[in-house]
Amino acid sequence: MDDTNVRVNSAKAWFLAARPKTLTGAAVPVMIGIACAVALHGAEVRWVPAVLCMLFALIMQIDANFVNDYFDFMKGTDDEQRLGPKRACSQGWITAPAMRFALLLTTAVACVVGLPLILYGGWEMILVGLACVVFCFLYTISLSYMGLGDVLVLVFFGLVPVSMTYWLVAPASPLFSIPLTVIGLSLACGLVIDTLLVVNNYRDIDNDRRTGKRTLIVKIGAKNGRRLYLWLGIAACIVNFLFCYLPAVWPWLLPLFYLPFHIATYREMVRIDKGAALNLVLGKTARNMFLYGLLTVAGQVLSLTMV
């Protein structure tokens, strides 16, 4: 959607603030968790919690975008030197009080959507939900400024959503019975999604240094940041391969077709090096991430049909 002629607090402003292009990062882990359940349990999967998990993830991603927009604006991080996509509060599209109300409202809606999951996972789901909400707020408010963002991405865009989605969608079983295959795929998913954060922070390294935001890329430097980006994608495929032990092995290797796209994007990242042109790399990284998710899901489904 065109970001010109945006009226304050209009529907167009809210659509842009929700940043719909980021929703794939929330959808992919849930897709993989559902696919794992289908591969291991076939027709026994429970589709109601699958839908609820997807809705919860998407709403929480929008909430995280609102939180990020609001608190970065209040901290002065989003100024005229920002290289990334335009933010609603800093552009004046949405007033700070309206954004504050919106982020609280979306948090409440996410909690309401997630509440029925207690029926499938027990009261433990309250703790999981609270952890997601705390992560949503603390990431922008403080943790991303301490270089902990990448660890949190591995946990809350990998281990938690994939494993919890699998556990809720699969037939009722103890929490600690989640197969190692699912744990491995959740870790691989987190590694791939972290490439998005790495290229985002790589693009913003100079601005983050200036504003005191100590991201991991600021700490390790641009050169090591590029290396980290490359090896995250490679490590994801290695982890994915190591945890493949279903009888139908070859479909589990489908995610390897992600690597050529990832390496090509890495080379473009090295070539561009600095500036707003890195937004092209960010877009291609998001594409690669979604491709990885689709390949992994396809591998799971094929493993069921080929056993």
Predicted segments with their positions:
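Topogenic membrane-insertion module of multi-pass membrane proteins
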Residues: 1-48, 52, 56, 146-149
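Small-residue-rich segments of transmembrane alpha-helices in multi-pass membrane proteins
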Residues: 28-33, 152-166, 189, 217-222, ...
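Membrane-embedded alpha-helical segments that form the functional core of polytopic membrane enzymes
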Residues: 43-68, 126-137, 177-199
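Acidic (Asp/Glu-rich) catalytic motifs at the cytosolic membrane interface
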Residues: 59-83, 195-217
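Multi-pass membrane catalytic core of lipid/isoprenoid biosynthesis enzymes
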Residues: 80-120, 213-248, 286-287, 292
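Intramembrane alpha-helical segments
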Residues: 87-173
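Functional transmembrane core segments of multi-pass inner-membrane proteins
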Residues: 153-205, 211, 223-227
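Extended hydrophobic alpha-helices typical of membrane-associated regions
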Residues: 245-305
